[in-house]
């Protein structure tokens, strides 16, 4: 490509206020991208050459799996997986004659809900690679899953990208056995955590930590109810907080440490169905008591009690009364006071938490 044909306009003056990262500034000054309007930019000739090279790499690797290309219309109302599933149901002989079927499309799609308006590299249009694999048996599907994981690793490696294989959440099925391959980038929108000393990698919503709780030998003190004389932020000692949830019509009370944050995705995975918080006006409907009279020790028998792993061995802790922020319970001992409680991991991790494999601490990264 001759330099006279590169089309590198001087757009620094126009884009200077929006470009904050050095890598973004490089893409403009070197003639890869140009401005069009907010949240839209132009791929200049150099960028098109790079895109074609990437497409060639993708196509070469997919052909190794005997994958064939198809393409839906850009503005199609159907997702590709819906179209293909419907097609195969109508014409099952396409799959019966093969142990598996591999298809892919490289498609430009319009992003309806753009969250980062004004961010230069956030575009209303994105180009996606969708790859699909259909199988007669679960064994064949599982084997091909690992082939695809290696395929995407090869694609990223050939593009000279640093990447991580990360445990993730399938948001459609809420299954936590999914993996995502994320290319490291300080400008990325994907957040994940990594162990400082091992190969543990997980998205924030599914990441776990090593439980630090140990069984205490302290004597259980009598449970008492008191009135606040000081602010919760200034109060000494360990505190619990309670959440009132439901899985369908099943009422749930869940206990966390005051400093932890509830992760509803983990609770949903525990019940294998969607779990939501109960609105204050619905408390009586699901828990049989009005909010202002709520007593967690005298709820209906069908209520399920849950506690985070860090709660299990707490002794003589405190908790604000659910019915009044002016009152609190003292000397709560979960193993004594909630004998039917089930303990599991229900919290978001925090940076610096111990890695679940016991090696190092968790560090937050972007990609």
Located regions from the model:
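Generic short alpha-helical segment signal, independent of protein family or function
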Residues: 59, 63-67, 89, 93, ...
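Short, basic and Ser/Thr-rich N-terminal targeting/leader segments
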Residues: 66-68, 97-100, 177, 238-241
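Residue-level preference for alpha-helix termini and adjacent loops
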Residues: 6-10, 32, 40-43, 49-50, ...
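Extended, low-hydrophobicity, polar/charged segments
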Residues: 55, 85-89, 114, 118-131, ...
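Conserved alpha/beta core surface patches that mediate binding of polyanionic ligands
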Residues: 5-26, 78-130, 237-238, 365-367
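TRNA-binding/sensing appendages of the translation machinery
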Residues: 1-82, 127-171, 255, 259-260
